[in-house]
UniProtKB/Swiss-Prot annotation:
Alphabetized GO MF terms: sialate 9-O-acetylesterase activity
Glycosylation sites: 107, 138, 188, 293, 356, 427, 448, 462
Record's subunit section: Disulfide-linked heterodimer of a small subunit and a large subunit.
The enzyme's E.C. designation: 3.1.1.53
Example GO biological process: carbohydrate metabolic process
Protein name: Sialate O-acetylesterase
Source species of the chain: Mus musculus (Mouse)
Domain of life: Eukaryota
Disulfide bond annotation, renumbered to this chain: none
First-tier enzyme category under EC: hydrolase
Keyword Transport in annotation: no
GO cellular component: lysosome
Length: 541
């Protein structure tokens, strides 16, 4: 016969072990933490995490001693996850979020404090998005201004890659934080994106309520690594798994390095921009998909440099498809709380290296960033906005001319687009002028461009505008100097063409102009005209 003492001791030990094991797996998702910003009304914020299968989880939102709301759910198998959607909340705070897991008589409690409600924006892309405030112009002043923006909270995802879609982040680079000179200026390409921070700061200046900024970027990366397999399949992207970094690639070369020839030999060009992972979908899997349950206001994106010489012609499909896929994923992941067609902003590529060279494919990528429309929103890219950056060159950047340091102007132009597209602000100029009519005046040897806005011609040269001149089935691009201009029209001289003019293009080079000195701007906002290319009809278009 066994004495009661040892049996009772064994029972207590078993109960203790069960109790501990029941609480070990109970946690919030990786990005639910102190100081976070949750999406405000009209959407509901999603709170989720992991727990013990079969357990009940009660999520309570409190402010001081007041209980604002309670939501009850259970831990689902086989994912061992729980999730609730909070009722829509007005902007403000701070609040506390408490989650309590109950399994039989055992309770385990988690808390996060100083939680705000506002708008949450995800920022992603490659190195120009990854650059920190310490790397930009006037860094000291920008870092000294953080005290005024304690309601703009920041979060940064670690550099992680995965062959499969992850449900949660495996690492966090910077957990939700109030901005400081330390975490904004932590070093080069670490912690927090300068473009993201400045964009959020400009939004806060306008909206005057909390902004949450989530940075998930990796320098030197193709769009393919940020795209799901669904996106790549939809665009017929070859399923390459090449891990080479910085290896020479074969690409066509302009004959004698000029842009006038239509056929070119091939040469080997070192791909100096590719320093990140190259395996398709690995960053989508590890750095974007784990965020899918987060309720978002929108996304801003700065990427494309690496695709200037890699799958360039597929970019016009991949970028709109990426936007559509991200929208669908975040909508369903957030239980329908993130808008199905949430606003998506992006930066059109700036300049790189050699002046007046189109050898790096930048003009084509800029065009493909708009799905070959030249402007956004457009039928293939609804509810999008773009910051044109062709005039923000920086040949003296210590990080290379591909990394211009004026991120303030980039972010300001982005925030104008957000105010117009995401927030519906009326009568706000948020993009530069584009031709709405192109008329060939053949008898006078002139081409008349009528713009959709008032224009200011900042500079006249014989290189910015070009015409495609065809003779005997051979076409080449020739300069078309500005003849005259007025408030909304600009006339080009076609005398250089002795054949038939079939197309016109503007700013179609890697380096279109010097800093803020491109040819055409909007008169009052001084937003630059974006690059364009258009076929010419003899009856006008």
């Amino acid at each position: 016969m066994v004495s009661p003492g040892p049996v009772f001791g064994i029972v207590l030990l078993i109960i203790a072990r069960v109790s501990r094991s029941a609480g070990i797996g109970f946690r919030f998702a990786s990005y639910i933490d102190n100081y976070m910003v949750l999406q405000k009304e009209p959407s509901g914020a999603v709170i989720w995490g992991f727990g013990t299968p079969g357990a009940t989880v009660t999520v309570t939102l409190c402010q001081g001693q007041e209980t604002i709301m309670k939501k009850v759910t259970s831990v689902k198998e086989p994912s061992n996850t729980w999730m609730v959607v909070l009722d829509p909340m007005k902007p403000g705070g701070p609040f506390e979020v408490m989650a309590q897991q109950t399994l039989g008589t055992m309770n385990f409690t988690l808390r996060v404090h100083d939680v705000l409600f506002g708008d949450v924006w995800l920022c992603s892309g490659q190195s120009n998005m990854q650059m920190t405030v310490s790397q930009i112009f006037n860094a000291s002043k920008e870092l000294s201004d953080t005290a005024a923006y304690q309601s703009v909270r920041i979060f940064s995802v670690s550099l992680i890659q995965s062959e499969e879609e992850l449900d949660d982040l495996t690492e966090v680079d910077l957990s939700w934080s109030k901005p400081t000179a330390g975490n904004l200026g932590h070093g080069n390409f670490t912690y927090m994106s300068a473009v993201c921070w400045l964009f959020g700061r400009y939004l806060y200046d306008t909206l005057q309520y909390p902004i949450g900024l989530v940075s998930s970027s990796w320098g030197g990366t193709y769009i393919e690594v940020w795209s799901s397999r669904r996106t790549l399949k939809a665009c017929g992207v070859p399923n390459t798994r090449d891990e080479r970094v910085g290896q020479p690639e074969i690409k066509p070369m302009r004959n004698e390095c000029n842009s006038e020839e239509s056929s070119c030999p091939f040469r080997v060009v070192p791909s100096v921009r590719v320093t990140g992972p190259t395996r398709h979908s690995v960053l989508w899997n590890a750095m974007i998909h784990p965020l899918q349950n987060m309720t978002l206001k929108g996304v801003v994106w700065y990427q494309g440099e690496s695709n200037a010489d890699y799958n360039r012609d597929l970019y016009t499909c991949m970028f709109p498809e990426l936007i559509e896929d991200w929208r669908q994923t975040f909508h369903y992941g957030s239980q329908g709380q993130t808008d199905r067609f949430f606003p998506f902003g992006f930066v059109q590529l700036s300049s790189y290296m050699l002046k007046n060279s189109s050898d790096y494919g930048f003009p084509e990528i800029r065009w493909h960033q708009t799905a070959d429309f030249g402007h956004v929103p457009n039928p293939k890219m609804p509810n999008t906005f773009m910051a044109v950056a062709i005039d923000l060159c920086d040949r003296d950047s210590p990080f290379g001319s591909i990394h211009p340091r004026d991120k303030q102007t980039v972010a300001y132009r982005l925030h104008l687009g957000a105010r117009a597209v995401a927030y519906g602000e009326k009568n706000l100029t948020f993009q530069g002028p584009l031709p709405k009519k192109i008329e060939l005046l053949a008898s006078n040897g002139l081409l008349n461009l009528t713009y959709d806005q008032e224009i200011q011609v900042q500079m006249q040269d014989n290189k910015t505008f070009e015409i495609s001149c065809c003779s005997d089935r051979h076409c080449k691009w020739l300069p078309a100097p500005v003849n005259t201009f007025s408030t909304q029209t600009l006339i080009l001289d076609l005398n250089a063409c002795l054949g038939t003019v079939v197309a016109v293009r503007y700013a179609w080079t890697t380096w279109p102009c010097e800093y803020k000195q491109c040819a055409v701007y909007h008169t009052s906002s001084m937003l630059p005209a974006p690059p364009f290319i258009a076929q010419i009809s003899h009856r006008g278009i």
